[in-house]
């Protein structure tokens, strides 16, 4: 077994992950900012793991999630060298918020690919 490691993305040919049941107009509009070569659907924390394994580059989540939906996947992604960024503040996604609701976020393999 080899350790998980995010890939070095090609900004002109990114693989994006989308939620099977939560794709919305805001997410579609955000994805259109990028040069996408491949799109995959996956459920829940599996999206974080696909980025951690180097099989995808970007997962925008512009919909409601709770801390328990993302904590394990985020830990795996961070351990593999990836990032989870608050879409509004561009800061890392933090936990322990009142109400435990996450802001919109982007999980990604490399900070250099994120667009405003």
Task: Please place each PLM-identified region on the residue numbering.
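Acidic beta-strand-loop-alpha-helix segment within the catalytic core
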Residues: 1-48, 97-116
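Hydrophobic residues within well-ordered alpha-helices
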Residues: 16, 50-52, 71-78
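Alpha-to-beta junction loops
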Residues: 53-58, 81-83
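Acidic donor-binding loop at a coil-to-helix junction in glycosyltransferase catalytic cores
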Residues: 68
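A generic structural signal for short
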Residues: 36, 61-62
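Acidic, metal-binding active-site segment of PIN/NYN-like and related structure-specific nucleases
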Residues: 82-98
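Short secondary-structure boundary segments
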Residues: 20, 63-65, 87-90
């Amino acid at each position: 077994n080899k350790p998980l490691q995010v890939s070095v993305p090609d900004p002109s040919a990114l693989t994006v992950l989308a939620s099977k049941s939560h794709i919305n107009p805001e997410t579609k509009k955000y994805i259109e900012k990028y040069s996408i070569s491949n799109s995959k659907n996956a459920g829940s924390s599996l999206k974080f793991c696909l980025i951690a394994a180097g099989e995808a580059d970007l997962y925008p989540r512009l919909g409601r999630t709770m801390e328990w939906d993302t904590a394990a996947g985020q830990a795996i992604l961070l351990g593999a060298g990836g990032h989870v960024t608050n879409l509004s503040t561009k800061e890392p996604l933090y936990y322990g918020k009142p109400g435990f609701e996450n802001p919109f976020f982007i999980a990604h393999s490399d900070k250099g690919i994120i667009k405003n």
